[in-house]
Amino acid sequence: MTPNILPIESYDHQLAEKSARLKAMMLPFQAPEPEIFRSPADHYRMRAEFRVWHDEDDLYHIMFDQQTKQRIRVEQFPVASRLINRLMDALMTAIRAEPLLRRKLFQIDYLSTLSGKLIASLLYHRQLDEEWQQKALELRDQLRAQGFDLQLIGRAAKTKIMLDHDYIDEVLPVAGREMIYRQVENSFTQPNAAVNIHMLEWALDVTQGATGDLLELYCGNGNFSLALARNFERVLATEIAKPSVAAAQYNIAANNIDNVQIIRMSAEEFTQAMQGVREFNRLKGIDLGSYNCETIFVDPPRSGLDHETVKLVQAYPRILYISCNPETLCANLEQLQHTHKISRLALFDQFPYTHHMECGVLLEKRH
């Protein structure tokens, strides 16, 4: 696989290899057969970032070969959405012709949505002034005239210039409903929108008929908690990053959801609050004791759940665990298998043609 060419003909083979690998990893835990969710074979990634190479009068996107560290010129990037590919060409053509915009530009980050919106962030090794801002406004207007629904952002050391705002709104069809998700520049969003829809619909399916409330740790912009709200009486969710919490609050209102409460705290802090170890001002007005959470949802970082959080989740009858690293999932399952058994298993091909696997397990308390 190179940045310019995807081995589309090997898609099925690489997916079968991942499925076999996941089955082997789950063998010690008596997991059921995995449900397999495919990705589109190309143009599946909604985010991309490129370094910018200056070569006399020329200017172009580059990536580095992971093995050889060689520089590769990237004109088109079939991994990324078609919208990003169209903008890459138009943006670079426009910047090439404008010395003020190209000077010390070293990176461009792209974020796109299925709803047709884009953010392009231009990163510089120099201070950005009013003159830059004027040229950036002209660039934005030029690209909008070409049909791009675009937000343009300039970044330099300790500087961020937004010409309008730093977010775009995604609209995802999830099990018969359109869900609105505000996505903030430089904050985490699921990179593969088609697979994200599969994950949300699978999570809805496995929690069908659930009783009580849902607790979610690491909720981000509310991706899962808002979609799952329809299956539960109430949802209590935690998130540490301020921009994500703000986006989640917006998403709750935009989707007319009235049974989700977001708290800004880490999973570790929440564990302390639940165990009564510490009191937090942020929890004033929230009666944790009134929640009857029978299901807990976790989508942790690659490092998995820490020992204390594993102990916390073991107290719940149902654990829904989405993992972007099956190795740390297996390490957590070593502990969880003593109290819970796996009743559903899924493989989501979020990152085709790479060794990375995203998977989901539903664990239910042993009787």
Swiss-Prot record:
Looking at the UniProt record for this protein, which Gene Ontology cellular component terms does it annotate, in alphabetical order? Answer: cytosol
NAD among keywords: no
Which catalytic reaction applies to this protein? uridine(54) in tRNA + S-adenosyl-L-methionine = 5-methyluridine(54) in tRNA + S-adenosyl-L-homocysteine + H(+); uridine(341) in tmRNA + S-adenosyl-L-methionine = 5-methyluridine(341) in tmRNA + S-adenosyl-L-homocysteine + H(+)
| Active site as annotated | 324 (nucleophile), 358 (proton acceptor)
Q: Which GO terms describe its biological process?
A: tRNA methylation
Keyword list (alphabetical) reads:
Methyltransferase, S-adenosyl-L-methionine, Transferase, tRNA processing
Q: Please list the residues that bind S-adenosyl-L-methionine.
A: 190, 218, 223, 239, 299
Under the heading CDD domains, the entry gives: AdoMet_MTases
The EC number on file is 2.1.1.-, 2.1.1.35
Q: Would you identify the family this protein belongs to, as annotated?
A: Belongs to the class I-like SAM-binding methyltransferase superfamily. RNA M5U methyltransferase family. TrmA subfamily.
Please identify the protein, giving its name as recorded.
tRNA/tmRNA (uracil-C(5))-methyltransferase
Underlying gene:
trmA
